UniProtKB/Swiss-Prot annotation:
Extracellular side: 19-23, 73-78, 140-204
InterPro entries associated with the record: Arch_preflagellin_pept (IPR054964), Preflagellin_Peptidase (IPR052218), Preflagellin_peptidase_C (IPR009655), Prepilin_IV_endopep_pep (IPR000045)
Protein EC: 3.4.23.52
Native organism taxonomy: Archaea, Methanobacteriati, Methanobacteriota, Methanomada group, Methanococci
PANTHER family: PREFLAGELLIN PEPTIDASE
Protein name from the UniProt record: Preflagellin peptidase
Organism of this sequence: Methanococcus maripaludis (strain C6 / ATCC BAA-1332)
Membrane topology, from the record: Multi-pass membrane protein
Underlying gene: flaK
Length: 230
């Protein structure tokens, strides 16, 4: 249980960092991974059960591969690193299993829990527009048109110099709004650095992952069972 609590604290801290600055400090996932392996060594020695250590190491290795694949796919690097930390910290945790996929993932030395947390987290991304809305409100964005009201859920309003640094795509300004900017919509030359424009959001995946981490011990793979019964 202590591993689960530490994992929850790490994810909450990472979520706050990601929400405020769109950056997750490396010390969080490193601490989770190191503590996970050290605690597994301690538990294996005291309980004379070395499968605990094997699970932690295999969880780290498998989640490292999955996290690297996420990075290559363009998904946030910080989110993949948190997966690595959780793989070493809580590779296994009690949760209900309803599907054949869940049964397959529940094999020995497969980090069932963190993988299911990330799978459920992807489904929880349906709530991300409300996270984006809340962040816009906190940043002082106020819609002046109907289009801007919609953008409160799907874009972010920020100064041009910040958007350039973060390599965002331009969605527009005032009534000239493009809800689906192309990859080359990053010509900021027509704006001054202090102007505020609407740009594409950087998806804070760590927030739905944190929510998933808290509820997955209760729901297991029930979402998969409901949406894709097999």
């Amino acid at each position: 249980m202590i591993e689960y609590i530490i994992g929850a604290l790490g994810l909450i801290i990472a979520s706050v960092q990601d929400f405020r600055s769109r950056e997750i400090e490396d010390y969080i996932w490193i601490f989770l991974a190191v503590f996970g392996v050290l605690f597994a060594i301690y538990s294996s020695i005291t309980l004379l059960d070395y499968s605990i250590l094997i699970n932690s190491i295999s969880g780290f290795v498998i989640c490292f591969i999955l996290g690297y694949m996420m990075f290559l796919s363009g998904i946030g690097g910080g989110d993949g690193k948190m997966l690595i930390g959780l793989g070493a910290l809580v590779p296994k945790f009690q949760m209900p299993i309803y599907t054949s996929l869940g049964t397959l993932l529940n094999l020995n030395y497969v980090p069932t829990f963190p993988i299911m947390v990330f799978i459920n987290g992807i489904f929880f991304m349906v709530f991300l527009p409300f996270v984006i809305l809340f962040r816009n409100i906190l940043n002082g964005a106020r819609p002046k048109t109907g289009k801007e009201f919609i953008l409160m859920f799907f874009g972010e309003k920020m100064k041009v110099n910040v958007a350039k640094e973060q390599k965002r795509l331009i969605m527009g300004q005032n009534d000239k709004i493009n809800f689906f900017p192309a990859a080359d919509d990053e010509d900021f030359s027509k704006y001054s650095n202090n102007e505020e424009i609407w740009v594409t959001p950087q998806i804070p995946l760590i927030i739905p992952i944190t929510l998933s981490y808290l509820v997955t011990p209760i729901i297991g793979d029930r979402i998969l069972d409901f949406l894709i019964p097999f």
